[in-house]
Amino acid sequence: MEDEEVAESWEEAADSGEIDRRLEKKLKITQKESRKSKSPPKVPIVIQDDSLPAGPPPQIRILKRPTSNGVVSGPNSASRPALPVKSLAQREAEYAEARKRILGSASPEEEQEKPILDRPTRISQPEDSRQPNNVIRQPLGPDGSQGFKQRR
């Protein structure tokens, strides 16, 4: 580039053919580089053709997870140990024991026999002192006016 002559304007460079020579030189260089870099594609491209029958679908296998000791359990073997069947009397005894441990009483009947004193009793009003249901109230506004019935 140092030995090349630089034209004063692009018009002089075009007239002398300098632009054409430079373009041809750059074009040759890029063509040589593209030839060198051309190599077979590294990944083969598979084009599917619908006319050919597809292969069989892939096999799907369901694997069983091994148990804690490393042995795969069969479909008929129970994963949990069988619980012994308890009689009604045994279940009621366990229930009473748990209830006594948690609530402090062994049977629910003890609780129902005691009157509940925690709740206040309802005081019934005599029928005469109650207000009749047919009373129509007129609401008053904050300033003592007739409220909603006031006309403007």
Swiss-Prot record:
Q: Identify residues that carry Phosphoserine.
A: S37, S39, S51, S105, S107
Per UniProt, the ranges with Polar residues bias are 66-79
Bias regions of kind Basic and acidic residues — which residues? 113-130
The organism sits in which domain of life? Answer: Eukaryota
Which residues does the annotated region (Disordered) include? Answer: 30-86, 99-152
Positions of post-translational N-acetylmethionine modification:
M1
- Phosphoprotein: is it a keyword of this entry? yes
User: Is Amino-acid biosynthesis a UniProt keyword of this protein?
Assistant: no
Q: Which InterPro entries match?
A: SUZ (IPR024771), SUZ-C (IPR024642), SZRD1 (IPR039228)
Record key words, sorted: Acetylation, Phosphoprotein
- Segments forming domain SUZ-C: 111-152
Check the UniProt entry and state the signal peptide residues, or none: none
Q: Indicate the segments forming the SUZ domain, all copies.
A: 42-107
| PANTHER family listed in its UniProt record | SUZ DOMAIN-CONTAINING PROTEIN 1
Query: What's the family?
Result: Belongs to the SZRD1 family.
Q: What is this protein called?
A: SUZ RNA-binding domain-containing
